[in-house]
């Protein structure tokens, strides 16, 4: 259920910065036939600046509108808050919850283990750990992941450390049914080669059909085609991180006529200079004329 190409969805906003639910529906129409599941209300969905009510409403809307499996963002640096969010995401109709490692307070490995264990004990839906040290200031090590994999409803990890040795070690030392998903578009193909099962993707918001083509080529054993697609998509992977995510991907969606709106403060719109670079890449992929 949770393999393949899974977009980390943007949350489109209206001019007054309220959530644009019609925009979400429009983006779902663009995504659904190309992707395997959906992640609303994560980092790319600007969860950090959504109210609790908005957060849950976005997850609920996606779960009710789409026929695809939904992994709802539910992380917090407070264990009590993460438990509450995970319960609410479950009630909203998500098939799984994704929990970023607690940030800022920097717990040690035992604290991280107890955090995830506590959340897992309070919900019945599967949980995916989200490791992104560049944002949280803390790394989920292979040793810790091995322990977490023993908890019944922790089914996998979104790995965005960028450390292929660590990723390889996680795959090597966890059970075969433990799912590792790339959290870095550029590393999707290398991680698939190591035994990863897919990607939670920013680029899939923009080019879901091309991400699907790369993934399916790999699964079908056409490694040469998968490699060609990786190289073709690399400029997109790069330009979508020319500024803080999701600033560039929102600009790309605007240029393509999809729903995005401006990011909420403290994030600001992409500069004109960087916007031109986004345009060039979109044109090269025939996503805009």
UniProtKB/Swiss-Prot annotation:
Alphabetized Pfam families for the sequence: DHDPS (PF00701)
PROSITE patterns: DHDPS_1 (PS00665), DHDPS_2 (PS00666)
EC number of this enzyme: 4.3.3.7
Protein's UniProt keywords contain Lyase: yes
Annotated catalysed reactions: L-aspartate 4-semialdehyde + pyruvate = (2S,4S)-4-hydroxy-2,3,4,5-tetrahydrodipicolinate + H2O + H(+)
Keyword Isomerase in annotation: no
GO cellular component: cytosol
Compartments it resides in: Cytoplasm
The entry's keywords: Amino-acid biosynthesis, Cytoplasm, Diaminopimelate biosynthesis, Lyase, Lysine biosynthesis, Schiff base
UniProt xrefs under InterPro entries: Aldolase_TIM, DapA, DapA-like, Schiff_base-form_aldolases_AS, Schiff_base-form_aldolases_CS
Site features described as Part of a proton relay during catalysis, chain residue numbers: 43, 104
Active-site residues, as the UniProt record annotates them: 130 (proton donor/acceptor), 158 (schiff-base intermediate with substrate)
Disulfide bond positions: none
Highest taxon in the source lineage: Archaea
Record pathway: Amino-acid biosynthesis; L-lysine biosynthesis via DAP pathway; (S)-tetrahydrodipicolinate from L-aspartate: step 3/4
Xref: HAMAP family: DapA
Known partners and oligomeric status: Homotetramer; dimer of dimers.
Function: Catalyzes the condensation of (S)-aspartate-beta-semialdehyde [(S)-ASA] and pyruvate to 4-hydroxy-tetrahydrodipicolinate (HTPA).
Family label: Belongs to the DapA family.
Name of this chain's protein: 4-hydroxy-tetrahydrodipicolinate synthase
